[in-house]
Structures are given as structure tokens and as C-alpha cells.
């Protein structure tokens, strides 16, 4: 039976599930189409919004003036320094805008770069829609001024430096146009398609116009522009020969013809760069320049380059620089046409291939050979041909040829103004397997020649002296030699120590030979006896002098006294008598050498006078039957000295006492007692009206019971009829501010008393009384006069970790003291006409006060014409009578201004502390001054400020064991060092903030160098001298 296959039909109805799936698929297709359409519309809308300016990116710049210091790492966007600071800036910007009226529009920010000039920040801002530049700038400034970011505690932004412009992303740049040696910035209108960055003064734009860098960074051998345009040879090609970067192993550059001066001066600069590890040798085929036109040769490039030679007039011979990079600059300031300039060639060489004798041997005919000037000394050796000036010191010819054609080296010629070390260093020398002989010729001629020393040192900082000569050896070249046997790498150093005036030292023909030094064929030189034998500096004594043995002199009088002398004479009189000291002749080196006269025995005596310089000087009178005279000289010049005598008697120099019914004025004259404190000056010096009211039994210098002096008797004020106006009037008489409070005080006895009433003209009427109504006295408290308040708003800043530039007006009581035109010390303004400073500043400089000048309101010593500045001469100097220069105790002095000053925002007095007020250890106080910023460095231009913690005297004594830290001193500083006052800060304030007023806690006195660990600064403790200071103010 056959079978039959059944084929299903092609058309059938869909199942329920199939219908559902089909419907869902169709819906999904519609949704996708819709989403695509919405996305397309959104994109087109965004493009339209962008076209209409609804999405916005702006670029901004601002300057951070404190809280962060610029360093080269901020140029590297991958550095930790860049990332940390950029994060903080972006956080600050975000916090400000998120709390501003633009919080809905603001999206984010991005720091692009940092530039030098404090720290300049360039950043981008992104907003969801278009915002005007003015609106962005206004919100940013308001946020900074309102401290809307926690980051503003860490650093300060100069709001005047903030600038906002359209982002440069959609704009083209205009490159700076150039001339031969000068860049100028073009500034087309800021319209879409064309914008150029505007640079701050002293900066120029890079070629991409995206970045500004300092003018000095152009053509300095280091890339500072991202596009490298700051070192572009087209820009940097010199006006002298059209060259700039020299990179071959040898080459040349020249200023064969001076370029015509288009400005006040022209600078031609070349960069020489050879392979790493090589050094560079320079030679001059000719060299004939004007004295004003200087060729400087530096080791290295960029900001780290080191000046190795300054050349003018004469061919310097060969110069070798031990670096693979050299910067050469030729500064042309003359318009002379008679000078042909110079032609220089350079060659690379490998100094490591030199042997020891090649490194040492030198007759200076061809420059300094391979010797190097010591950069850590005080001056430089000079290469000399022929005679030096002045006469009577230094050679007339070299040693090599024995005539004026040869060369030698000498310490700086001329009179000189100080003692200085002049050093010459060899390259590192290889250890020797056998001894070698170092030989040389030296010339030490002149009345004041000091010392020539030769040292060797190794990399372990072990140094030893192998040769030394001192004194004047006459007009001869002298031979010197020393055997060396060093087993490790070492250097040789020639050190000449030069005094003032006739003290030149010269060298020639240095050589190194193998084997020990032979016995010298030349006789050992002997010193020239050009001066008498040195006098002993110890006078003997102290000498006890009594009548009739009353005449005494400085040592060796009438001939010059010795240097470094210290002499003491004790003058004696019978009990009840006093002493008059008279100088018949007097001539000392000014300031440096002094006669100090004290009232009584030295240990606890009071200072009577300090005399120095040429005479005549005034007689001095003791108040006791003993007087101490000290004579102290330094190690420089000497003079003829002095001859003195003394007499004894009763009341010598003291005015005759007044009658019982008279008052004796401070100038000695007498006035009737009834005229005392009557409101009218009867004494010519006004002393009869000087001390007529005081506080009694007060807990502070501005409160207590009130007493008035009627004739010679003090009367306590009654509370009867006392008014608020009375309080104000009495407080004013006391030299204080307005009355703060007054209250009755019950007391029985203690008379006599005085009742106060106010006259119709407002003056006080005093009526003596034996009793007060209800035994009620007045207890008065006065406000202090306005003091210790900063008038110029100061930004909040973090704790200073080192001396920092202060803001103008930050310390309006800090005064700069100039002596003979030189900034010498600091001081503090305590009233309209009195300054507090250090006694050691004025010691020996007190006889002619008008040589001192006080500059108030000063911020920068380089700008003495600022409108905030007021200058006053000093007309009186008072050293605290307890000051002891040798013990450095009571180091405080008062200086009176010739004319009173008016208080301004930049000139204000500082407050005085209460007498014996305690400033506890650990308290953070402030110091300020223009002194040296590092030990043996240069003084500061801008007023420096720093915070320092106070130390106990016990701890200070442990850290300063060589000094006696007395109760009149206080100390401040960090154990780790790094913050301290230094030379030039003396006399300036140590200031502590209390109740929103700055108090003068200390006066900068002394220290051991500056800012060393466990070496605090020492200050005169002002609370110990408050009463003494106030005696000048009222």
C-alpha cells in the first residue's frame, strides 16, 4: 500500500503570542526613532545654543601675593607642586562660584599654568550658558573679599590683579612683533577670531600668545615658553654679530663694531653649549672696550648661572669655565666710537684629562690657567701687568720676566675699606703615589699687610693649613714651597687676608713638581720693621686713683694708642664728695674706640657718658664719691688718645640747693613753691608743671587713686563733685585717653586731700582740704591712648614659617633709623615725638644726634619718596643709665624726634606694656625689620615680618650659655631655628597682641649669628623699663 506526503499550507493565521511580539517590536522601533530624533534635536539645539553664546568658557588670571612661593616646579604640570596648588586653586574657585549668584551656571574650572611674579595663575572657567566677563569677575572678587572659600586662609589673592577674558580656544593668536633685541606686544581689538594676551609689566608673551614670561627669561639659554619661542634665534640674535646659540665644539663671537645705540643701552648675549662633561675655553684675539662697556662671563645658563668674570678695557687672556654651558653678555652703555670691541673664540676641552701639574702650573701670562676664583670669599683676585696703585704696596713688575711686560695676580688694588679674604682654588687633584712639591712666589709689601695662607682640603671636609705668613716682607718677590703627600683626592687653596689701606698681596709662578721639596736656595724672608713693636693691649690695673694723683692718659700718649685695648681707671673721692672729670686732650677713632664713664663702681654703676671721635668733650660729674672710666678700642685704626684729670669737692656740677620755699627746676634754677603746678611754666624747662598728677595704689598704669601735687605735697582727690568730664580732664593730664570709669572709694585717714571743681572756662579748680565728704575718695580708671592698632586692613594669613614680606601699613609703629645716610637699626614709635630703640645702636653715636634720621611709614628702603613716608631728624638721645655694653644688659634707649609727627594710616604708636607685665613662655609674638635676611647676607628691601614663640629665661640661658641672661632680657625663637631677627633689625620691636592691641614686649638686642637651631634671639624686656619710658612721654 503506497504512502502520501502531506505538505503544510503557506498561509495560516498568527498565534496570540506572535501578534504580541510583533506589536512590541513595532513600539520599540518607534521609540528608537523618537530617541534618535530627540538626540538629534538636542545636539542641534546645543549647537544652536553655542552659536548663540549660551555655553561659555572664559579664561582668567590672578596673582597670589602671599601664602605660596613661586618655584620652577610650578612650570611642570606633572610635578607634585603644580598638582597640589592647582587642586587648591580649583577648589577655591569652585567654592566661591557655588556660593555665588552664578552657582547654577558654573560647571568647573581648570588651572592651565603658573607664572613667576609672586605666583600668577592662568585658569579656564566653564559655564552652562553664556555669562559676561564683567559678571564673572565681579562674583569672583566678591567671593574672595567675603572669604567664601576655606582656601583663602592659606593664601592671599590680589583682587586688583583679577582679569577675565573670552577663552582663547576659539580664537587665533597674534605673535609678538620683534626688533633686533626688543619684543613688543601687539594688542588688536578683542573680537572673535583675533585676540592677544596682555602681559604684566616686566613680562612678554610667547609666540603662541598663550603665556607671558618675565623679560629676563628670554634668550637666557633655558626654555620657558611651551613653544620654545623665548629661545628663538631670530628673536635672540645679537645686535653685535647676529649670533646667539653656539653649539659646535668650537666657534667664535664678536662685537667687532659697536652697534649704534638705539636706546640708553644695548645688551648682546650669547649662549655656548657643548657636550655634557666638557668644559669651555675662551680666547680673545683682540679686546679693546670702553670702561663703561662690560663683558660678563657666566658659568651655566638661566637663573642659576654664576658670574665668573667681568671684563673691560684690557685683554683678559684665556678664560676657562668648568661647565658645558656658558652665558656671555656684553652691556654697551657708551656711545664712544674709538673702541674696536673684541673678537672671541671658544673651544671645548675635557678637564678630566688634565694631570696634576697641568692643573697647578701657572705663570698667569695666559690668564688664570686652571685656577678658579673662590665664590665664597669676600673679593676676587685681579690679573695685573706692571705697577699697582696706590704706591707703597704691591709689586712694580711680575716675577716671571722681572719687568712690566709680565703678568701676576694680586688682591684687589686700591685703598680698600674693610678686612677681607680673597681665595683661589685648584681643580680636584688626584692622590699622589709619591710626594710632590708645591712652589710659588709671593709678594707681601705694605704697612698693613696681614696674612697669606695655603690650605688643602678633601671631599670629607677635612682642611689643614700647610703654609702661612703674616706681615710686611718688603719690596721683594719671596719664594715659598711645601711638600704634599696626599692619599685621597684633594684641592689646594690660596687665601690672602687683606686689611684696609696698604695691604696688597700678590702671587706668581705657581708650580707642582714630583718629589719632595729640596732645600730652598732662597733665604727665608724677614719682616720689615715698618712700625714700632706692638703695644700690650692690657693696660694693667684697674688703676685706683686718689688726689693728688689725678692725671691719667691713654697708653703711649701722646703717640697712638694700641688696638684692642681695654683699660679701667677707678677715680676716688672722700665720702660726701663727688668728682669732676676733665679731658685736656681727646682724639679717638670715631665710633669704634670709646671712653665710657660710669657713676660709681662698674658692676652696679650708672652710665654717665660715652665719648668718641675728636674732642673737645664736656666735663663729667659723678653723683657719688667714685667714678669708673673705661677705654675700649677695636682692631682697626688708632689715634693719639686722651689726657685727663679729675678734681673732687662738694656738690661739683650740681646747682646750689634752693631755699625751703622754692622749687628747684631740673635745669637747676629756683622758682617759688607757690608757683608749682599752678598751670603756668615758671621754670624755663617747664619742669614745674611736668609732674602734677599721678595714680596711687593702682594695679595698672591707667588706674588708681588720683593725687595732685600742691606746692611740694601730694593730695589725694575726693569723690565730691566728681563728674565724667572731670574723669576725662584728669586722664588727659595723666597723658592717657578718656575716662573709662570712676567710683567712690571709702578710706579713713591718709590726708591731705583735694576737692576738684570745674571753672566756667573748663579748667580744674583745686581746693586743698583736711577731709573728704563721707571719707569718700575717687578711684579712677582711664582708657589708654589709641595705640597698637593697625589702620590699614590686613588679610588673614597662616603662621609665618620664615621671614616674609609684610604688607604696606602692617606695622605702622616700626621706624627705620639711618645714621650718616645708612640704614643701621630699627625703632618703635611710642608717642608723637619719642622712639624706643636699642642702646647698642646709639652707643658711640650719641654725641651728634642730628646725624641720625628716623623714617616713619616706610615699607621699601628702595622707595624713600613714597607719600606715606615722614622723615624726622633726631635731636636727643638718652641711653638707659643701667646699660652695660659688655654684659649687654638693659639694652634700651630713647630717641627724640626734632618735630612731632601726625598719626596716619601708616604712622601709629605701639602700646607700652604694664610695668613688670608678664609675657609667658610659649606665647607667639611678632618681629619686624629691614635687617639681613640671612646671616652675612644683604639687608631686606621690603619690611620683613615673622612670628616667634617666647622662651623662659631658664631655657634661654641653657641655649645661650656664653651670655648671662638677666631679668632685663627675654628670648624668642624656634628650637629648629630658621626664624630670627638679624643684623640691621637691632632696636626694632618684639610685639605681642593683647586685647586687640599690639604691645611692645621687647627691643631687639643680640643673638648668636642668626636663626641657628637652639640659638634664640635676645630682646630687652620692655616691662622692666615701662616707668622709665613713660617718664619721657608725660
From Swiss-Prot:
Keyword check for Membrane: yes
Disulfide-bonded cysteines: 199-212, 206-225, 219-236, 240-268, 539-567, 658-670, 665-683, 677-692, 772-782, 787-911, 825-841, 925-992, 956-971, 982-1010
CDD domains hit by this protein: CUB, LDLa, MAM, Tryp_SPc
Extracellular side: 48-1034
Domain MAM, residue spans: 357-519
Keyword Repeat among record annotations: yes
Pfam families recorded: CUB, Ldl_recept_a, MAM, SEA, SRCR, Trypsin
Compartments where located: Membrane
TM regions (residue ranges): 19-47
Propeptide: 1-51
Function: Responsible for initiating activation of pancreatic proteolytic proenzymes (trypsin, chymotrypsin and carboxypeptidase A). It catalyzes the conversion of trypsinogen to trypsin which in turn activates other proenzymes including chymotrypsinogen, procarboxypeptidases, and proelastases.
Protein name per the record: Enteropeptidase
Organism: Sus scrofa
Lineage, uppermost ranks: Eukaryota, Metazoa, Chordata, Craniata, Vertebrata
Gene: TMPRSS15
Amino acid at each position: 500500500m503506497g504512502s502520501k506526503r502531506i505538505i503544510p499550507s503557506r498561509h495560516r493565521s498568527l498565534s496570540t503570542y506572535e501578534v504580541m511580539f510583533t506589536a512590541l517590536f513595532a513600539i520599540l522601533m518607534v521609540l528608537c526613532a523618537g530617541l534618535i530624533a530627540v538626540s538629534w534635536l538636542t545636539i542641534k539645539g546645543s549647537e544652536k545654543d553655542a552659536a548663540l553664546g549660551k555655553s561659555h568658557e572664559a579664561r582668567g588670571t590672578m596673582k597670589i601675593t602671599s601664602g605660596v612661593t613661586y618655584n620652577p616646579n610650578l612650570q611642570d604640570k606633572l610635578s607634585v607642586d603644580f598638582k597640589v596648588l592647582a587642586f587648591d586653586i580649583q577648589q577655591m574657585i569652585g567654592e566661591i562660584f557655588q556660593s555665588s549668584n552664578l552657582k547654577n551656571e558654573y560647571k568647573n574650572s581648570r588651572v592651565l599654568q603658573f607664572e613667576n611674579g609672586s605666583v600668577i595663575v592662568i585658569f579656564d572657567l566653564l559655564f552652562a550658558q553664556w555669562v559676561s566677563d564683567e559678571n564673572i569677575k565681579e562674583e569672583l572678587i566678591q567671593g574672595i573679599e567675603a572669604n567664601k572659600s576655606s582656601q583663602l586662609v592659606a593664601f592671599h589673592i590680589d583682587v586688583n590683579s583679577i582679569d577675565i577674558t573670552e577663552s582663547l580656544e576659539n580664537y587665533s593668536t597674534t605673535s609678538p612683533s620683534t626688533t633686533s633685541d626688543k619684543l613688543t606686544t601687539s594688542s588688536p581689538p578683542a573680537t572673535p577670531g583675533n585676540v592677544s594676551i596682555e602681559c604684566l609689566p616686566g613680562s612678554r608673551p610667547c609666540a603662541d600668545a598663550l603665556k607671558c614670561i618675565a623679560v629676563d627669561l628670554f634668550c637666557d639659554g633655558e626654555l620657558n615658553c611651551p613653544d620654545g619661542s623665548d629661545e628663538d634665534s631670530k628673536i635672540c640674535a645679537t645686535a653685535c654679530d647676529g649670533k646667539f646659540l653656539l653649539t659646535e665644539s668650537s666657534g667664535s663671537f664678536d662685537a667687532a663694531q659697536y652697534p649704534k645705540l638705539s636706546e640708553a643701552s644695548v645688551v648682546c648675549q650669547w649662549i655656548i653649549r657643548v657636550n655634557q662633561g666638557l668644559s669651555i675655553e675662551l680666547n680673545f684675539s683682540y679686546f679693546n672696550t670702553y670702561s663703561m662697556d662690560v663683558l660678563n662671563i657666566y658659568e651655566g645658563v638661566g637663573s642659576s648661572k654664576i658670574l665668573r668674570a667681568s671684563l673691560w678695557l684690557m685683554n683678559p687672556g684665556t678664560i676657562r669655565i668648568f661647565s658645558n654651558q656658558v652665558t656671555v653678555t656684553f652691556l654697551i652703555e657708551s656711545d664712544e666710537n674709538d673702541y674696536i670691541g673684541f673678537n672671541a673664540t671658544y673651544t671645548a676641552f675635557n678637564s678630566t684629562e688634565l694631570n696634576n701639574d697641568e692643573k697647578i702650573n701657572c705663570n698667569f701670562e695666559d690668564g688664570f690657567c686652571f685656577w678658579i676664583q673662590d665664590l665664597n670669599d669676600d673679593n676676587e683676585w685681579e690679573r695685573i701687568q706692571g705697577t699697582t696703585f696706590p704706591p707703597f704696596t704691591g709689586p712694580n713688575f711680575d716675577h716671571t720676566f722681572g719687568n712690566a711686560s709680565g703678568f701676576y695676580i694680586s688682591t684687589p688694588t686700591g685703598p680698600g675699606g674693610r678686612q677681607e679674604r680673597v681665595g683661589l682654588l685648584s681643580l680636584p687633584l688626584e692622590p699622589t703615589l709619591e710626594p710632590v712639591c708645591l712652589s710659588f712666589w709671593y709678594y707681601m709689601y705694605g704697612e698693613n699687610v696681614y696674612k697669606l695662607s695655603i690650605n688643602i682640603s678633601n671631599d670629607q671636609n677635612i682642611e689643614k693649613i700647610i703654609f702661612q705668613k703674616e706681615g710686611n716682607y718688603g719690596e721683594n718677590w719671596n719664594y715659598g714651597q711645601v711638600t704634599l703627600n696626599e692619599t685621597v683626592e684633594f684641592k689646594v687653596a690660596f687665601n690672602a687676608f687683606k686689611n684696609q689701606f696698604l695691604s696688597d698681596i700678590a702671587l706668581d709662578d705657581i708650580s707642582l713638581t714630583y718629589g719632595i721639596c729640596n732645600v730652598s736656595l732662597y733665604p727665608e724672608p724677614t719682616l720689615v720693621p715698618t712700625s714700632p713693636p706692638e703695644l700690650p693691649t692690657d693696660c694693667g690695673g684697674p688703676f685706683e686713683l686718689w688726689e693728688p694723683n689725678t692725671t691719667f692718659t691713654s697708653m703711649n700718649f701722646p703717640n697712638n694708642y694700641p688696638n684692642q685695648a681695654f683699660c679701667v681707671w677707678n677715680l676716688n673721692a672722700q665720702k660726701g664728695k663727688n668728682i669732676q672729670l676733665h679731658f685736656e686732650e681727646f682724639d679717638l677713632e670715631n665710633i669704634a674706640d670709646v671712653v665710657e664713664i660710669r657713676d660709681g663702681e662698674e658692676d652696679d654703676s650708672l652710665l654717665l657718658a660715652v665719648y668718641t671721635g675728636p674732642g673737645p668733650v664736656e666735663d663729667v660729674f659723678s653723683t657719688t664719691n667714685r667714678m669708673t672710666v673705661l677705654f675700649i678700642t677695636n682692631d682697626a685704626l688708632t689715634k693719639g688718645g686722651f689726657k685727663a684729670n679729675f678734681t673732687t669737692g662738694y656738690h661739683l656740677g650740681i646747682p646750689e640747693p634752693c631755699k625751703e620755699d622754692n622749687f628747684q627746676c631740673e635745669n637747676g634754677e629756683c622758682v617759688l613753691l607757690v608757683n608749682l603746678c599752678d598751670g603756668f611754666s615758671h621754670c624755663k624747662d617747664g619742669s614745674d608743671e611736668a609732674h602734677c598728677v599721678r595714680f596711687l595704689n593702682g594695679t595698672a598704669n591707667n588706674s588708681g587713686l588720683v593725687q595732685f601735687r600742691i606746692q611740694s605735697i601730694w593730695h589725694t582727690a575726693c569723690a565730691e563733685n566728681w563728674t565724667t568730664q572731670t574723669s576725662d580732664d584728669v586722664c588727659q593730664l595723666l597723658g592717657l585717653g578718656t575716662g573709662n570709669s570712676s567710683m567712690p572709694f571709702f578710706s579713713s585717714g591718709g590726708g591731705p586731700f583735694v576737692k576738684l571743681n570745674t571753672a566756667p572756662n573748663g579748667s580744674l579748680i583745686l581746693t586743698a582740704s583736711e577731709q573728704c565728704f563721707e571719707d569718700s575718695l575717687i578711684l579712677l580708671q582711664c582708657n589708654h591712648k589709641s595705640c597698637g592698632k593697625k589702620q590699614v586692613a590686613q588679610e588673614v594669613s597662616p603662621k609665618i614659617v620664615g621671614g616674609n614680606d609684610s604688607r604696606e601699613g602692617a606695622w605702622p609703629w616700626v621706624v627705620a633709623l639711618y645714621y650718616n645716610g645708612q640704614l643701621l637699626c630699627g625703632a618703635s614709635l611710642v608717642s608723637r615725638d619719642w622712639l624706643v630703640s636699642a642702646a647698642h645702636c646709639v652707643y658711640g653715636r650719641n654725641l651728634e644726634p642730628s646725624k641720625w634720621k628716623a623714617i616713619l611709614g616706610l615699607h621699601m628702603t628702595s622707595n624713600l619718596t613714597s607719600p606715606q613716608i615722614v622723615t624726622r631728624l633726631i635731636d636727643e638721645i638718652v641711653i638707659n643709665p643701667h646699660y652695660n655694653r659688655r654684659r649687654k644688659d638693659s639694652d634700651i634707649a630713647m630717641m627724640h624726634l626734632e618735630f612731632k609727627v601726625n598719626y596716619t594710616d601708616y604712622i601709629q604708636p605701639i602700646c607700652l606694656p604694664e610695668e613688670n607685665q608678664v609675657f609667658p613662655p610659649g606665647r607667639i609674638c611678632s618681629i619686624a625689620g629691614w635687617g639681613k635676611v640671612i646671616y652675612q647676607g644683604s639687608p631686606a628691601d621690603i619690611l620683613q615680618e615673622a612670628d616667634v614663640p617666647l622662651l623662659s629665661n631658664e631655657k634661654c640661658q641653657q641655649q645661650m650659655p656664653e651670655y648671662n641672661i638677666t631679668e632685663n632680657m627675654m628670648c624668642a625663637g624656634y628650637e629648629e631655628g630658621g626664624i630670627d631677627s638679624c643684623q640691621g633689625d637691632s632696636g626694632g620691636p618684639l610685639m605681642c597682641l593683647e586685647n586687640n592691641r599690639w604691645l611692645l614686649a621687647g627691643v631687639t638686642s643680640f643673638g648668636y649669628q642668626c636663626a641657628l637651631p637652639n640659638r634664640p634671639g635676645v630682646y630687652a624686656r620692655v616691662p622692666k623699663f615701662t616707668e622709665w619710658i613713660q617718664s619721657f612721654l608725660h
